[in-house]
Amino acid sequence: MKLINQNQVEFFQGSVAYDAGKVFFFESRVFRGIFSDRYAQMYNQFLKEKWIDEIFEAGLVHTVVSDDIKLEGALITLEHKKIPFMTHPAERTPYSFWLSAKTLVRVNLLLSQHGYVLIDAHPWNVMLEKGNPKFIDFTSVYRSNRISRDWFEEFKKYFCIPIWLSSNQWHEFSREYRREHLNGFGLKLFETRFLHKIFSFLMGFGRVIGDPVNFLRQLDKWLDEHRPKKNLSADWPEYPQYEIAQNPLDSVLPKEKFILEVLRAEKPVTVLDCAANKGHYSEIAALLGASVASFNYEEQCVDECLLLAQKKNLDITPVVMDFKLPTPPHSIGLLYGSAYKRFKSEIVIALGLVHHLCIFQRLPVHIFCKICMKYATKGILFEYVDPTDSQVKSWGKQIPDNYSIEGFNSYFNTKFSKSKISKIINDNGSKRVIVYYFS
């Protein structure tokens, strides 16, 4: 057993206010020191229960009492399974967010059958692991035979309202509501007496809150009745992503072969796939052993990627985000980092993207490059689409002066001094090259 001093570890600032314990990071692992005798005894017993694996399978983050690390001053030191990427509630699709609510209720239901409940019910404690929601606030577990009314009010405020909006196909309103933390127009609006009446039917659940199992089953039924309807206002879900080979790692296409060559050589631990569509290149990176954050601005594409991760048990975290508008830091004191911090990865993949942004949408070339470099620590896999490409020519748009392979080289080389370039991909009117920038 290795005893470590508190000065040797990095504490997660968001947990320092809790009496139960403090989350800290050490040697790329996630721990929690428990300093309260009452909580230490409770969690020691909880983790020895014969049904504990059922709770983990339902969605509580997998946790053990560490057998090799002990934090000085802590009565026990827990180790949590590490979640590769932290996500914001507004980065979830309506379906993914609904799954998070279902997971939270399911975990609480199973706990309540064994004399425990959850104290907290907000979405900042639910993350994604291989496409599956995981409730990460282990010290929200508490021995009790009653669900608190505060838990129900928090669940209504942060889960029921945005889910109700999505179930009525008000997807953008739902996402904007989820962007807000403690204050905001949406949160204030739904506190008004008029709109409060919309959710009066939920108040009936309060009559059975003293019977946790019955209460949570009714809440779960409400969620089933309000499963979000698919957002049909999308442009890219039918965009083909190559699946020539049954195994993506066996592809013979020049573009994929170059990408495979780079990823196999570099062996990145983390990868960010920008504008990933349905996640084809995310799958390739994950199959090669990387933890992958995969984002797209269209919800249907992200849901396809989510289902891919679940079906194939891939370490992919699919989120909704616009490349041009990374999620800013949030929470009290901005303790939860921006997208730049949370999705920072060794290699950034930016394929089939630059011409849409820099030519069609007029995003300045230097800003495109700056955004990519903000995420990347080791290198960038970049697809350059030439102005003579048939798709670009069909738009009839003016080409920016610095939109050239030389222009991109000059910007990317400020951080990554070396580069490797593929052969020109010239097929059916396309003219593109893949460049790997690295140091």
Report each predicted region and the residues it spans.
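Conserved ATP-binding subdomain of kinase catalytic cores across diverse folds
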Residues: 1-119, 129, 162, 166-190
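Conserved beta-strand signature within the Rossmann-like core of class I S-adenosyl-L-methionine
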Residues: 374-386
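Conserved class I S-adenosyl-L-methionine
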Residues: 268-277
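S-adenosyl-L-methionine
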Residues: 306-342
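A short, conserved alpha-helix within the catalytic core of class I
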Residues: 357-371
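Conserved SAM-binding loop of SAM-dependent methyltransferases across substrates and taxa
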Residues: 278-290
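Conserved SAM-binding motif I beta-strand of class I
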Residues: 291-296
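Catalytic activation segment of kinase domains across protein kinase-like and atypical kinase folds
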Residues: 117, 122-168
